[in-house]
A protein has these predicted regions:
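Short glycine- and basic-residue-enriched patches
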Residues: 1-81
């Protein structure tokens, strides 16, 4: 029997959470995130600073549109395998 590791879901911006996002950007991984009750799955493009906010830019796989998500607005996120 094979055990499957759980995908870590982050609810706060801890150093581990930021490391996971940075790794997702480097590896162009998918990120499932929830903002204002809406769930998105995007391909991580870049992390940047906008004013006083850190922003994740993610591309929607179906349309190719790039959306910007302020990290402080995220309720949860998980980097998908």
């Amino acid at each position: 029997m094979t055990s499957v590791a759980a995908i870590p879901e982050y609810r706060t911006l801890t150093p581990d959470a930021l490391d996971a996002l940075e790794r997702a950007v480097r590896e162009r991984r998918r990120v499932a995130l929830r903002r204002r009750g809406t769930e998105y799955v995007v391909v991580a493009e870049r992390l940047e600073t906008s004013g006083r906010d850190e922003v994740l830019a993610g591309r929607l796989p179906m349309t190719g549109e790039v959306l910007a998500f302020r990290l402080r607005d995220l309720e949860t996120f998980a980097v998908l395998p």
